[in-house]
């Protein structure tokens, strides 16, 4: 049961490194200089977005055997590893919403929209298909988002300029490849191959 919380937390925290929502957090922190409403907006947006993604994943998971889900999870980890190596860029449309609303509402809207189709949302779908405790998966993916984004919000421009993002992306990609290997091993076990 603890895996349903800890694995999603780690996976999403790794996937979020250098992601466009992390860049968005940095921009919002620099623009508003009010970290707590921004963090609250991240929590609300992530819970809403990942709850929907988790529901889709739980529904999706009901159609497949454990072996098939392990193979799908392994493929998604490999894809996420490759995706992690590509730096995200923040769209100008997402940054332009900051003028219309305050820090909380701007963050809520911008993060919710930025997460649609993002690798962390896709990871949430796959994790919810894999683990039976949906609420723990959603809490875990939300914690992962916070682990990656809260330091960026609190540190602002200073931390983002000093971090070796290329090295961090490579380490995160390596971690995803390791997770893919573990998932392949579990898929082979579930398929009766080993």
Each predicted region: which residue ranges?
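Selected transmembrane alpha-helices and immediately adjacent juxtamembrane segments
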Residues: 95-121
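Juxtamembrane boundary at the C-terminal end of a transmembrane helix
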Residues: 182-194
């Amino acid at each position: 049961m603890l895996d349903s919380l800890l694995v999603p937390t780690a996976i999403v925290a790794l996937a979020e490194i250098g992601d466009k929502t992390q860049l968005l957090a940095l921009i919002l922190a620099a623009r508003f200089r009010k970290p707590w409403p921004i963090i609250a907006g991240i929590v609300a947006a992530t819970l809403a977005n990942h709850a929907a993604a988790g529901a889709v994943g739980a529904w999706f998971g009901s159609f497949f055997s454990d072996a098939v889900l392990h193979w799908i999870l392994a493929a998604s980890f490999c894809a996420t590893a490759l995706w992690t190596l590509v730096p995200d860029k923040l769209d100008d449309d997402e940054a332009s919403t900051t003028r219309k609303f305050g820090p909380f509402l701007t963050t809520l809207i911008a993060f919710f929209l930025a997460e649609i189709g993002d690798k962390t949302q896709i990871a949430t779908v796959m994790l919810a298909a894999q683990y039976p405790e949906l609420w723990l998966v959603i809490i875990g993916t939300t914690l992962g988002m916070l682990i990656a984004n809260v330091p960026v919000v609190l540190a602002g421009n200073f931390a983002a300029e000093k971090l070796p993002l290329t090295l961090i992306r490579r380490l995160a990609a390596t971690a995803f490849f390791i997770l893919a290997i573990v998932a392949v091993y579990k898929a082979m076990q579930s398929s009766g191959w080993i």
